[in-house]
Amino acid sequence: MESRVLSRATTLSSLPTLNKLHRLPLANASLPSVKSFGSVSDGGNLVWGRQLRPELCSPVLKKGASLLRPCPATAGGNDSAGEEKVAPVGFFSRYPALTTGFFFFTWYFLNVIFNILNKKIYNYFPYPYFVSVIHLAVGVVYCLVSWTVGLPKRAPIDGNLLKLLIPVAVCHALGHVTSNVSFAAVAVSFTHTVKALEPFFNAAASQFILGQSIPITLWLSLAPVVIGVSMASLTELSFNWLGFISAMISNISFTYRSIYSKKAMTDMDSTNIYAYISIIALIVCIPPALIIEGPTLLKTGFNDAIAKVGLVKFVSDLFWVGMFYHLYNQVATNTLERVAPLTHAVGNVLKRVFVIGFSIIIFGNKISTQTGIGTGIAIAGVALYSFIKAQIEEEKRQAKAA
């Protein structure tokens, strides 16, 4: 049986025989042909993908030479099994901080573009239920095309997971529609200021519905949020009750979405989960859109919009607003998976600052001094709350690890 170990000492001791090998006739010095193997199941040694024969098998070594050389691999040889190749390091792996920054920039950029284009559509086509359906429909088509080409590969869904995702999708649909009703009724900056109250509703739901103990420091950090939103609401020039109440319902809906999401934790990747939620939410949103806005749309809605901007622009605006809506949500999910909870929290706060600031600049919304101060206080409160909550979560994680 062939030996499986080639002793380094044997090889080193045979080095003086190099000159002897050099003087041997070519016919006697030639080594037997050695074939390169992708894998070796029994006998032989692999060095950089070449199989070496033990010294007992070499006719040259019988003449006193014990130096072994690997033969060149054949053209069809496969070195992958014998040599552990170092995978090339890509740009994203080499510069993780820069990559994360790029993800955040893309998330903010898509979010700002969506909010601006969305509000421009409402200025000439004030039908938020229908536009909400378009947002989800474009996203669903995008997901179906992605599944078709295998980017990503569709993850199968069973009845149990479907039952868990339906409540999440219903809350997502309600929160999405009411957000758009608010966007159509009031200034974008005001809607986002009211939606800054979402952490307050999350804390309340955790305390009184889930029975979780919320530290007093978290409750105190929410006081500036409530005060700031109240100040901004009292002097908001575009204020109306429809916009305010719709934004509040959106906060409650997204809070319940978070609760149901915790119950629907699964190993499925976030891209597939969001795709299934979008499909279910679309089915939920279609009936109210047809009932509430359908007759008016067929009578005057579509014709008025086409008369104002033209058919091509109208259709392209609806397509792109849906595309930006889906992409910003998907990139947000992918971004937040890359970072720690504290970075996640800061990112959410900065996103809202970006959207409020750009919407004021683009649309030239006039805001009173009190509204500006109230918005700033609310954003600062959200930042404080997010920081404290992230610290608490990190302490819990370290305690579990210990």
From Swiss-Prot:
User: What is this protein's function?
Assistant: Mediates the export of fixed carbons from the chloroplasts into the cytosol in the form of triose phosphates.
Q: Which InterPro entries match?
A: Sugar_P_trans_dom, Tpt_PEP_transl, TPT_transporter
GO cellular component terms, semicolon-separated: chloroplast membrane
Q: Which UniProt keywords apply?
A: Chloroplast, Membrane, Plastid, Transit peptide, Transmembrane, Transmembrane helix, Transport
Q: Which GO terms describe its molecular function?
A: organophosphate ester transmembrane transporter activity; phosphoglycerate transmembrane transporter activity
- Where on the tree of life does the source sit, at the highest rank? Eukaryota
Which residues are listed as membrane-spanning? 97-117, 130-150, 208-228, 273-292, 371-391
Places the protein is found: Plastid, Chloroplast membrane
Task: Write one Pfam family the protein is assigned to.
Answer: TPT
> Chloroplast intermembrane face: residue ranges?
73-96, 151-207, 293-370
Primary localisation category: plastid
As listed in the record, the transit peptide stretches over 1-72
Entry similarity comment: Belongs to the TPT transporter family. TPT (TC 2.A.7.9) subfamily.
Q: What is this protein called?
A: Triose phosphate/phosphate translocator, chloroplastic
Q: How does it sit in the membrane?
A: Multi-pass membrane protein
Subunit structure, interactors included: Homodimer.
Q: Which residues lie on this side of the membrane: Lumenal?
A: 118-129, 229-272, 392-402
